[in-house]
Curated annotation (Swiss-Prot):
InterPro entries: MraZ (IPR003444), MraZ_C (IPR035644), MraZ_dom (IPR020603), MraZ_N (IPR035642), MraZ_sf (IPR038619), SpoVT-AbrB_dom (IPR007159), SpoVT-AbrB_sf (IPR037914). Belongs to the MraZ family. One of its GO terms (biological process) is negative regulation of DNA-templated transcription initiation. The keyword Repressor does not apply. Pfam families: MraZ. It is found in: Cytoplasm, Nucleoid. One of its GO terms (cellular component) is nucleoid. Keywords: Cytoplasm, DNA-binding, Repeat, Transcription, Transcription regulation. This is Transcriptional regulator MraZ.
Length: 143
């Protein structure tokens, strides 16, 4: 399970250090793809296969389903680490998440999210402002 928040810098070649706590769980191969809310999702290969299986079961006769599957797969890349524990994030994915020098990596249960630091701070601030309403909705799920 991924959890925690880490700040790292993206270098000029699009390389980002992945914290050792996350590297250990990602193994040697994993998938990086566009995520929701303007971040990137990073899945261990085993978890990506589960996502892939669920997405393949969506009825393809619905336009929104087709669009979402395209969104998740079109720019997905299988990655590995270099000797320094970095990954190269392709330009198209960096543009999607508006990644600049300062990045935040967040563990979110079955995946890691990579955020532009400023966008992450805005997202957290908004979540904190609405936390009571969010929590109230989750009570229905037994949380």
């Amino acid at each position: 399970m991924f959890m925690g928040e880490f700040e790292h810098s993206l270098d000029s070649k699009g390389r980002l250090i992945i914290p050792s706590k996350f590297r250990d769980q990602l193994d040697s191969n994993f998938v990086v793809t566009r995520g929701l809310d303007g971040c990137l999702f990073v899945y261990p290969l085993s978890e990506w296969r589960l996502v892939e299986e669920k997405l393949s079961q969506l009825p393809s006769n619905k336009k929104n389903n087709r669009a979402f599957v395209r969104f998740m797969f079109a720019d997905a890349v299988q990655c590995d680490f270099d000797k320094q524990g970095r990954i190269i994030i392709p330009k198209k994915l960096r543009l999607h998440a508006e990644l600049q020098k300062e990045c935040v990596l967040v563990g979110v249960s079955n995946r890691v999210e990579i955020w532009n630091k400023a966008r992450w701070e805005e997202t957290i601030e908004e979540t904190e402002e609405n936390f009571d309403d969010i929590a109230e909705n989750l009570i229905d799920f037994g949380l």
